[in-house]
């Protein structure tokens, strides 16, 4: 039984328990006087960002004494939801859970983004980090990262590298792999992670760098092979798989992340309050258990630390992926 399958059942139980637990302290408030926090998820229901929001939402409500309403505003790689939050006034009491792609897309869109990161949207806190792995499908004759790179250099036309779309972690991490290895990899974007994995498993593409949260079940089943993990140390779920640096690709460290953002006009006092409450929720044993099963690790810290880290991430990927790439 895969760890991912177990995690889905655990998460569903946790979400159900959370909904029941929240009923007394928050819903008991007078509806006319209760403050509502709108938590926007810029992706469809069921993904890792959505599940994290539904685990944390009821607990945030309990600690804040507010009603938390989760709204999925999917589309354009997260830009639709992010644009809506960026346009909200501080009085709207709105926040967003965002994946890496949402914060790096405005930079690589070369001025085509409807909002400016760090001006129209400001970070509240980092939430979790998610390790990735370099994956190959059954049609690729490579047993190690070194063999994969050698194959990409020797095969006429190189190898096809799948992604979940422009600006996603599989895209930018793939571009970094191409840059550091010198291998010939051709980017093949897909409409989301599910399609990307389906094409990779089917042998219609050759390689992908993907979040372990979504690909671990396919590695465990043997449908995909992990040649390396992209973290600084080996992953407990895949102890026999080396890190990319151990496999000889120095400097190749990639981690996806989830973070909380608020409209740029949000007062600093409110940012600090939300930051503190999120950190408290993230320390709860049930939350730690659930995110661990999703291959996530807590990454909360002060507001200023979050901004410093996220600015560095935007700068890093802007150097890897040319401006305007997302519009190609």
Question: Where are each of the predicted segments found?
Answer:
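An extracytoplasmic/periplasmic, membrane-proximal ligand-sensing/linker region
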Residues: 34-36, 180, 268-328
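Short loop/turn segments at beta->alpha junctions
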Residues: 7, 77, 144, 189-192, ...
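Beta->alpha turn/N-cap motifs
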Residues: 97-102, 163-164, 193, 210-215, ...
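N-terminal (or domain-start) structured segment
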Residues: 28-118, 158, 166, 183-206, ...
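N-terminal twin-arginine translocation
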Residues: 2-33
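A ligand-binding cleft/hinge motif common to bilobed small-molecule-binding domains
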Residues: 102-110, 176-180, 206-241
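Hinge/capping helix and adjacent helix->loop/strand transition within the periplasmic-binding protein
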Residues: 87-93, 108-195, 244, 257-290
